[in-house]
C-alpha cells in the first residue's frame, strides 16, 4: 500500500526433534525504493514559496525547534496576518485539524493545520497556523472547533502548485503573524533533524530554489530556550 513500507524482513524457522524444538531467526534487510514521481535531485523541487514572496519573511524557525513539534515556521511583520498561502508543489490533501488556540492575548482563535501527500512516495508536508481557509477546504471541517488539536482524515483533494489554500495566518487579535511549515521524508533522502522522535523531519530549505533557500537560511533563528542541536539545520543567529 502507498506510503506503507518496511526496511527488513524477519524469517523464523522452527525445527523440532520430538518435543525438543529450536527456533532460528534470520533478518533480511530490504532496499527501500520510493514509488511515484520522484526526482534524482530534490533541490528546487518546490515550484514556489508558500507565501507570495520570501521577502515577507522576517525570521525562520527550523524543524524540531521544540521537543513536541516537528515543523518550523515562517514569521512575517507583526500584524501582517492577511496574507495568501499557496501550495508549493502538486499534492493531495489527506488530513487536517481545526482547533481553538489562545494567543499571547489569552483569547482563543481558530487555527487550521493541513497535511499533504506529494506524488513522490514518502514525502509529506504540513502547513499550519492558518486563520482563514478557502471555502473548498474549510467546508471539509464539519465539527465545532475545540482545544483538541487532533488530526482528522479529510476527503482527498488534489491541488496544483500555486493553488490558494488560505488568506490569513497566525493570530489576528495580538498580531502574531506566522505560518507553520514542515516536511517529512520517510526515505530520509534529504538532511533531517536527527531528533529521535521526529527522525524524518526534513531540513526543508533545499526543496526551495537556491535563492529562496539562501534567504531562509539567513533568517533562521535558534532561540536559546529551544533544545535544538545547532548545525543540524544550520542557524545563522542565536537570540535570547
Give short role names for the model-derived ranges:
Residues 77-80, 149-153:
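Short alpha-helix capping/helix-loop boundary micro-motifs
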Residues 88-152, 177-178, 182:
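Zn2+-dependent peptidoglycan hydrolase active-site motif and core
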Residues 29-121, 158-164, 170, 200-201, ...:
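Surface-exposed, glycine-biased beta-strand/turn segments
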Residues 161-169, 186-193:
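Conserved binding-pocket/active-site segment within a compact domain
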Residues 175-197:
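Short, compositionally biased
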Residues 2-7:
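Surface-exposed, short loops/turns at beta-strand junctions within beta-sandwich domains
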Residues 14-21:
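Short, solvent-exposed loop/turn segments at the edges of extracellular beta-sandwich modules
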Residues 9-11:
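Hydrophobic beta-strand segments within extracellular beta-sandwich modules
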Amino acid at each position: 500500500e502507498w506510503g506503507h513500507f518496511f526496511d527488513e524482513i524477519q524469517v523464523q524457522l522452527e525445527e523440532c526433534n520430538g518435543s525438543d524444538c529450536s527456533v532460528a531467526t534470520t533478518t533480511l534487510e530490504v532496499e527501500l525504493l520510493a514509488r511515484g514521481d520522484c526526482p534524482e535531485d530534490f533541490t528546487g523541487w518546490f515550484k514556489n514559496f508558500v507565501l507570495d514572496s520570501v521577502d515577507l519573511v522576517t525570521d525562520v524557525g527550523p524543524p524540531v525547534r521544540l521537543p513536541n513539534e516537528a515543523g518550523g515556521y515562517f514569521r512575517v511583520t507583526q500584524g501582517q496576518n492577511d496574507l495568501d498561502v499557496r501550495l508549493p508543489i502538486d499534492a493531495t490533501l489527506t488530513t487536517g485539524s481545526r482547533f481553538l488556540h489562545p494567543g499571547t492575548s489569552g483569547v482563543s482563535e481558530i487555527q487550521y493545520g493541513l497535511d499533504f501527500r506529494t506524488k513522490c512516495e514518502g514525502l509529506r508536508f504540513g502547513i499550519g497556523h492558518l486563520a482563514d481557509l478557502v471555502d473548498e477546504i474549510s467546508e471539509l471541517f464539519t465539527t465545532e472547533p475545540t482545544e483538541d488539536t487532533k488530526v482528522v482524515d479529510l476527503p482527498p483533494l488534489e491541488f496544483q502548485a500555486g493553488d490558494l489554500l488560505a488568506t490569513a495566518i497566525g493570530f489576528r487579535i495580538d498580531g502574531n503573524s506566522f505560518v507553520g511549515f514542515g516536511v517529512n521524508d520517510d526515505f530520509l533522502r534529504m538532511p533531517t533533524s536527527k531528533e529521535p522522535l521526529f527522525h524524518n523531519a526534513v531540513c526543508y530549505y533545499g526543496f526551495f530554489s537556491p535563492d529562496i533557500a539562501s534567504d531562509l537560511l539567513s533568517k533562521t533563528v535558534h532561540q536559546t530556550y529551544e533544545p535544538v542541536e545547532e548545525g543540524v539545520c544550520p542557524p545563522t543567529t542565536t537570540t535570547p
